[in-house]
Amino acid sequence: MASEASPSSSATRSEPPKDSPAEERGPASKEVSEVIESLKKKLAADRCISIKKRIDENKKNLFAITQSFMRSSMERGGSCKDGSDLLVKRQRDSPGMKSGIDESNNNRYVEDGPASSGMVQGSSVPVKISLRPIKMPDIKRLSPYTTWVFLDRNQRMTEDQSVVGRRRIYYDQTGGEALICSDSEEEAIDDEEEKRDFLEPEDYIIRMTLEQLGLSDSVLAELASFLSRSTSEIKARHGVLMKEKEVSESGDNQAESSLLNKDMEGALDSFDNLFCRRCLVFDCRLHGCSQDLIFPAEKPAPWCPPVDENLTCGANCYKTLLKSGRFPGYGTIEGKTGTSSDGAGTKTTPTKFSSKLNGRKPKTFPSESASSNEKCALETSDSENGLQQDTNSDKVSSSPKVKGSGRRVGRKRNKNRVAERVPRKTQKRQKKTEASDSDSIASGSCSPSDAKHKDNEDATSSSQKHVKSGNSGKSRKNGTPAEVSNNSVKDDVPVCQSNEVASELDAPGSDESLRKEEFMGETVSRGRLATNKLWRPLEKSLFDKGVEIFGMNSCLIARNLLSGFKSCWEVFQYMTCSENKASFFGGDGLNPDGSSKFDINGNMVNNQVRRRSRFLRRRGKVRRLKYTWKSAAYHSIRKRITEKKDQPCRQFNPCNCKIACGKECPCLLNGTCCEKYCGCPKSCKNRFRGCHCAKSQCRSRQCPCFAADRECDPDVCRNCWVIGGDGSLGVPSQRGDNYECRNMKLLLKQQQRVLLGISDVSGWGAFLKNSVSKHEYLGEYTGELISHKEADKRGKIYDRENCSFLFNLNDQFVLDAYRKGDKLKFANHSPEPNCYAKVIMVAGDHRVGIFAKERILAGEELFYDYRYEPDRAPAWAKKPEAPGSKKDENVTPSVGRPKKLA
């Protein structure tokens, strides 16, 4: 017994561990004992103080209660007149004294006996009152009714409700007691060591002792001997106390920041543990928690709604900010660059960035963003610098007397200083992304005609450069310096920007404006890099998921996934940064050949979209559907239908195959089809493909779903659809009865009204409220999902009570409706039933449906055949043998308790 084993175990724990002399480091045992004794005395003193406080509080509460009782008793005493006692008055007016019934004769009426003195109310003379007793009619006793919990869907049994390994006591009808022992010695309950939890005083002693003396073997040994624990338990408890202290000191702010510093997988740990992806509910009672996460191999294309240039998502929408030219973080570009004036007093404003940003269309690719335009401006200025430096050096060497040569030499030095101020990492990144940025400039900043013109010019750029280099001397002699620079810029800069660059170079004070533009580009790039660093891992993960769902639409991403974290402009900045482009098209964003799945508008391309069926394309003609049964998915179903119809169904567990399932697929090995919950692609040959029924309403064996004892699934079947809503807002017009699927009754919970009443056969029964026709769905038989071993143990009690609520579901589970279920659990057995039960797979789960075997009128009781095995059926469920029939002696007895079959 556990009580006998506990002293020995506690004695073994109380023995202090024998430490070697080398391990005895730390304070002496005497010092540790003194600290523990002082803490013990302090705890005792604190306990005395707390007890005194509690006694004082109880005294006050007791005084208030006694005062209320005293007040109520005084009120009752004052209500009596002339000081008479209420108890005496009640005895005088009792019915026994008035009727003359002698209580000494067991309350039986004696007609000839002496008259018992009774006081009639209002008279002081005792008189005899003759009253004959009235015999109450005998009412039939109600049938025993077991308390049960209503279930609208099946639930899996919890571990604490199991009876396996427990000794159950059964009380029979005569009031006796019977002890049901285990079937074998293996199921005997093992005497486990009693676990003791740490109390609050023990935690206090452990924490304070280790804080004062430190963590050492000698201290742990003394604590173990004092608390009758092992050293490992003391050490583990100390670690738990330290963690609790750190959590309490950190506060909620640190917990929130730690959550934001996690990625999406870490933040969704509890979500994945509690959320059922099959039922789409939290804390699913059918499939349980901590399910294996199975993600589909094929993901749908991003949802890209039509883009309206004038429709914005808010004040911080990137469309509004691009049009206004005011960027959060660094204000307006015009305000930063300021104005420049030459000697004549002419003022110029560098409008290069603002003009490009305002001219951007919202439908463009991320490379057409503000960052790409700014980099385009930087590269354009760099190319201008290089070209002008080359021409200036040639001019200085060939004709040093040319006007303005000294000014251009100064410009060269200034630009070298500007280049030195730009970080080296930025220069390296610009060199690496020069090709991609040039393509983005051609596609984003230019019009389509200009982009084509740019592509044509790229093919002849080398020849043009050679021609210009050969005629450079002539151009330097005959042309002006401005013309030379303009011609050189037109070779390397897009056509849409050449006029703008030329105007800026020709303008007075262009040296100062270029320098300011370069400083502005450097500021913008630094601000963009700083913005990217402020993104936490959780926000980055949410952004990646938003790109996967909505594509390159910053408005939808900010509104649906980053609400409260980032604005639309911040999402747009992060999206258009060149460093983040690789992450958009990495992993799921790339095709196997390395090409991008997104086009210039952010839409998914090169994706294998499901072809539209010929049936939907040819709406005018209804062709004969050739639904094949030769695929591997229906081999097990066809075999069960033809050969093993009476065998139980197989429990479905989704597979996690990333490619088309092969011979080692768990579903294929188990003999089940792959469902929509599996991870394999839709091209898997083992996947159940639904039905193509058009006019049969899926109520005949020509429907593959109906023939396989399955309900149609709107996500899989082609023509089976469901009307959404409860009808309060109106029901859409139906396409006729020929298009309405009638094989989704359990899925839609379209059951009949069932009433509960006293049965004419046995106990309680189920009755139908409205008339139904043949093969109509009546309701579902729900209950607890238990194992077959559990069902055998529970069946012992059910056999003694001569009732059964066990229903065989599949090869792993049995339905038990004794404690939990619905009203159809009271439907009785009959050899000539008017209903029949059927196990149907609904959305990957086996469920039991009750259907009408014939036309049933309103008010009739429901019966169906429990279909017990012949050797396990109770006496009341056995069919009467025909006269002259011989008993089959070759039938082998089955193992287990009687269970209902469909």
From Swiss-Prot:
Q: Which residue positions does the secretion signal occupy?
A: none
Q: Which reaction does it catalyse?
A: L-lysyl-[histone] + S-adenosyl-L-methionine = N(6)-methyl-L-lysyl-[histone] + S-adenosyl-L-homocysteine + H(+)
Residue ranges, compositional bias (Basic and acidic residues): 15-33, 78-95, 875-890
Q: Where is the composition biased (Basic residues)?
A: 404-416
Q: What is its EC number?
A: 2.1.1.-
Low complexity: bias regions: 1-14, 394-403, 438-449
Q: Which domain of life is it from?
A: Eukaryota
Q: Enzyme group, top EC level? A: transferase
Q: Does the keyword Aminoacyl-tRNA synthetase apply?
A: no
Q: Which residues form the SANT domain?
A: 531-581
Cite the InterPro entries for this sequence: CXC_dom, EZH1/2-like, Hist-Lys_N-MeTrfase_plant, Pre-SET_CXC, SET_dom, SET_dom_sf, Tesmin/TSO1-like_CXC
Q: What GO MF annotations does this protein's record show?
A: histone H3K27 trimethyltransferase activity; single-stranded RNA binding
According to the record, the residues making up region (Disordered) are 1-33, 73-107, 335-522, 875-902
List residues binding S-adenosyl-L-methionine.
866
Q: Which residues form the CXC domain?
A: 638-737
Main subcellular location: nucleus
GO CC annotations? Answer: nucleus; PcG protein complex
- Give the multimer and partner information: Probable component of a PcG complex. In plants, PcG complexes are probably composed of a member of the EZ family (CLF or MEA), FIE, and a member of the VEFS family (FIS2, VRN2 or EMF2). Interacts with FIE. Interacts with RING1A. Binds to ALP1. Interacts with BLI. Binds to ATX1 in the nucleus. Interacts with EOL1. Interacts (via SANT domain) with HXK1 in the nucleus.
Its family? Belongs to the class V-like SAM-binding methyltransferase superfamily. Histone-lysine methyltransferase family. EZ subfamily.
Q: Which PANTHER family match?
A: HISTONE-LYSINE N-METHYLTRANSFERASE E(Z) (PTHR45747:SF4)
> By what name is this protein known?
Histone-lysine N-methyltransferase CLF
- Organism in which the protein naturally occurs: Arabidopsis thaliana
